[in-house]
A protein has these predicted regions:
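Non-heme Fe(II) oxygenase metal-center motifs and adjacent flexible, charged/small-residue loops
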Residues: 1-171
Length: 171
């Protein structure tokens, strides 16, 4: 277990319905090769791409409220990553934290196919921790986690897709 990570396996109800709804209704940005993206809430600049303000969908507002109640902050942005299948991946990285409100981190809600989230210690790269992220789960990382660990979504042997809803409170 990593200090600064909160993991809740069954955080939301009906993750399969939400997966199908978002997959079909979101206008996906396809500028990234490895995955499709979308952003809701406060304007956000991510990986040299600008996402303008877009109002939260009601389904995202419900999750926002639950994060506020459970973790203790109300996100104002949700960056969504859609991994179409197991070939879609994300390499080791730390998220940008200087744009986050003090005392907040990043909450990730997973829907669709279960995937692994691997953490690698920046100072001791051989220290790797793995969290399984089934549909409906939440993993929350404090800013301190980002300073000590990098995380990645490795390739997986599946034809099914996964959507990660990454909630932040941007300054």
């Amino acid at each position: 277990m990593i200090i600064g990570i909160t993991y809740i396996e069954k955080f939301i109800d009906n993750p399969d319905e939400l997966f199908e709804l978002l997959k079909a209704s979101i206008q996906w940005d396809e500028r990234m090769v490895a995955r499709k993206t979308a952003s809701f809430g406060k304007a956000y600049n991510y990986s040299q791409m600008n996402y303008p303000f877009q109002a939260f969908l009601p389904e995202l507002e419900q999750i926002n409220s639950k994060i506020n109640f459970t973790i203790g902050f109300e996100p104002n942005n949700c960056l969504i990553n859609y991994y179409l299948d197991g070939k879609a991946k994300m390499g080791y990285h730390s998220d940008q934290t200087d744009i986050l409100e003090e005392g907040t981190g990043i909450a990730i809600v997973s829907i669709g196919e279960a995937r692994s989230l691997k953490f690698r210690n920046i100072i001791k790269p051989e220290d790797i921790q793995t969290y399984n992220l089934p549909a409906g789960s939440l993993i929350y990382m404090t800013q301190d986690v980002q300073a000590i660990w990098q995380h990645a979504i490795p390739k997986a042997d599946t034809e099914k897709g996964r959507i990660s809803l990454t909630f932040r409170k941007i300054k």
